[in-house]
Amino acid sequence: MLRLFGAQSTAVGKTVENFPPQWRAAAQWKSRGAETLVALQAQSPSGLKKAAQALRQAFSADLYGAGETTLPAAVVEALERHDKLLICADAAAGALLEARLENLPGAEKVFDFGAVSYADPKTGPLIEKRARLPKDCTDPLRQALARAQAARRVVGADLSAACAERENDCVLVLSCRKGCFLRTVPAGENPALWLLDIIRRTAANKPQAEGTGFLPARRAAKKDALPGPQPKRHPLRRVCMTLLVLALLAALAAVGAWEYTNGNFYALPEQLHTLLTEHVPRPGATLV
């Protein structure tokens, strides 16, 4: 049995339909939320192996394990294999992860369970200070973005998780060196599993599931910096600048006309006519 998270059930069905007849393989799958379990059957070991390989290749990023492997165990394995340290930037993210990762072999090596991050009496306030949030900031997403990035820098971890809790949903944030992954999870879904999946994919450098966004480091820094409102420009400023340029050009033209006519503006039309007629080609002339 193969275990997928974030894969579309219809995509699994299409892959199974494309199994060549000579494999003599079939599959049954069941989805619960974002998780899909696929049970394979074949009349020969080679057919079973080829069918499993086809699914692994088609859903390489979604596949997190086989048999009795759980998603939390797959996350710990991915963090250990790629030597990544995971922390939480706030209590909301800690509540999602700590209960699911505790008692797993090796979890304490890759996850701090809040001991050196948000729950530490010294590090917690330092994270808030480094987040540089204005006192009047009430946007949960901006708070989560700022804390996730600040916590990763303060602790020196590879990955930092945060959770922005809102009335009808929550936004999961995972900060890494390149930026922040974000995913909005409705109230009816399981945010803990989605956060675990985002962590697993990031640790293994695999593509994220459809619907998970990414904010590059520079944009994320600007977003959590909460820049003040830009000064408003007066609506007539552009018109005034245009009129000023036109007035300047008119003044320059007047000075040129004054010099050309020796101060006699009445002679300007006649002199312009004379200037133009001198340059009109006459019969028999060669135009150079």
PLM region spans:
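A short linear hydrophobic-aromatic micro-motif
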Residues: W23-Q28, D158-A162
